[in-house]
């Protein structure tokens, strides 16, 4: 994939999610075309009713494919980074776990999403959360300053995933960790799916093979790598693209890895 194709993908993703941000809710993106509420969708992914009720209205947009909070093991005082933070849902939940002495940074490349998240933070009175405009391949975050990175159904949208993992490694402190929910491929995607931009911006066509994800993480320097597919996710992925064969190839997974302490 050349740089022109990279830019075309970024432009399509930015346009798609800008429209979702302005629509005030779940749109034809990772959640698919659906009339189901964002809270209901999130609870099906493992969030509790209490969690979906805790955040400001408009923060939960129903765009995830899992619950990275469940594997992040966040602690009071930690610095947490959310890759592709959207309306701020996971950031606000993380903020409650890390407390006033901690700090949460959300990075998103879509100006409308960053604006929405900042508005939501003001509505909720969050003082330990900030949102920065930037690409997850080139994070606006200093070296070695983050304890934990979370992300929910975003990295599959990147046209340069090795760069995403390399930059994640850069910003993590020694001993820092990744706790990600994302869509991965368990079989090679056919060309007709890979070339479908709607399926790409819908979090399916850009999925990397599980073995490729593991290799990218290893190359970046990570250890204790674990990619755990969630076969039950096929039921909601099927709803993202009715009438297609995407569930013959992709599944949601949790992705965990550690930056060595020394």
Where are these regions (language model features)?
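C-terminal lobe and adjacent flexible extensions of AdoMet/dcAdoMet transferase-like proteins
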Residues: 18-25, 31-32, 216-262
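Conserved alpha-helix/loop element of class I SAM-dependent methyltransferases that forms part
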Residues: 33-79, 83, 89-97
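A short acidic, Gly/Pro-enriched loop at the edge of an enzyme's catalytic core
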Residues: 76, 137-148
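Short, glycine-/aromatic-enriched active-site segment of Class I SAM-dependent methyltransferases
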Residues: 185-204
